[in-house]
Amino acid sequence: SGLQFAVLDGQGFIPFSRV
């Protein structure tokens, strides 16, 4: 339960959630 966002990695965007 928290904000959902994505991070840009060498292979592309990796979406993940964090509290």
From Swiss-Prot:
Domain of life: Eukaryota
Keyword Secreted: yes
Keyword Secreted: yes
Compartments, record wording: Secreted
Any one of the GO BP annotations: neuropeptide signaling pathway
Chief place where the protein resides: secreted
GO cellular component: extracellular region
Keywords for this protein: Amidation, Neuropeptide, Secreted
Positions of modified residues (Valine amide): V19
Family the entry assigns: Belongs to the periviscerokinin family.
Function, as annotated: Mediates visceral muscle contractile activity (myotropic activity).
Protein known as: CAPA-Periviscerokinin-2
Native species: Karoophasma botterkloofense
